[in-house]
Amino acid sequence: MPKSHGARPKLGVAYFGNRYVGHARSDLGEIADMGASYVVHTMSEADLRWNPSTMRDLIAVGTELGLTAWVTPWALGGVFGGEAPSYAVMEHPEACQRDNRGNHLPALCPRQPVFRQLIREWLDAAAESGAEICQWDEPHFARQWDEDSGRWACRCLACQEAFRETAHRDLPHDWDKEVAEFVHRSLAETVRWCVAEAGQRGLGSSIVLLPDGTDDATGWHELAALPGVRYFGGTPYWVFGGYPPEDVPQYLASWCARLVEATTGTLAKPLGWIQAFSIPAGRESEIRQGVDIMRTSGISSIAVWAYRACSAMSALAPDSPDLVWATVKEAFASTRTRQA
C-alpha cells in the first residue's frame, strides 16, 4: 500500500502523570483542540494493580472528546520503554534477565512465564479499558551489548535452553554474529507474541522500535506485516541521541525513509515520534523542523512525547517547557495548512 508523502498526518500526544479524571478532561480537551486525533495513555504495573477503573474513566473522557485511545505498557517488566518501576521485577527475581557474566538485571526475561502472564493480565485490562491500540514501545533487553564492557543480555536459563534447541550447542558468553541474531530474534518473537495476544482481545497494535536497534530491513518489514499491526514506527529522539542541530535533518530523514520502506506493501502506517522532552534552550524550533520532515517524508502518523513537554517529570523537563509546548502546538497547526 503506497504511502502519501506530504498528506496531512494523523497527530497524537502521549499522556501521563495524572489520574484525576476531572483534571484529565481539561488536559485531553487541550490535546483535542490542538488537532490531535489520538492520545497514548501510559498504563504501568501500578495502574494495572491500583488504577484499572481509573484508566477506563480517563479513556472514556478522551473518547467523548474524539480522541482514539492508545495504551502503552509503560516499563512493564522492565522490557518496554518508560520510567515506571516494576512490581514483577521485585517480586520475581528468579524470572529476571541475566547478563553474559551471570549477573542479575532489573528486568524480566521475555521468555519467562512470569513475563507472559504479566502481559496477558495487562492486555485484559487494556481491552476492558476501551482502548483501541496497544503500543509495544521500545522493546529491549536491560543490557545491550557494548564493546567497552563486553556485556550483553539475556543469558538466563530460559534463553540458554532456547538457543540450545535451535543451535544444538551452548549459548556463547562472548558476543558474536550468532548471539546478535539470537538476541534480535528473541525480541522479534516477543513482539510477535504480544501482537497476537492483543489481536485475540480485539486490540490493534503499534510497534515502536528504539533508534539503536537492529538495522535489519527485512525483519522490520516482517514485523510491520504482522496481522493486527496498524502502525510501525520508531523514536528517533535526536537530542536524546546526542545529535547536534546540523545533523538533525539527515538523521530524521534517514529514519523516515526506513520506516516508509518497512511499511510499504503492508497495512501498517508509518509512525514517527517527536521529542518534546529534555530540549535545551535555543533548540525548540527543531520540533517544528522534525514534524515537517516527517510529514514531507511520508510519515502518516506523528506523535509527540509527551503532554506539556514532560514538565511533570523534572528529570526530563526541557529548559523552557512552556516554549517547547507552544512550539508543539505551532507544529501541529502547520500540518493543517501546509501541503507538499
Regions found by a protein language model. Give the residues of each.
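Substrate-binding cleft/loops of secretory-pathway carbohydrate-active enzymes
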Residues: 144, 194-197, 201-248, 278-297
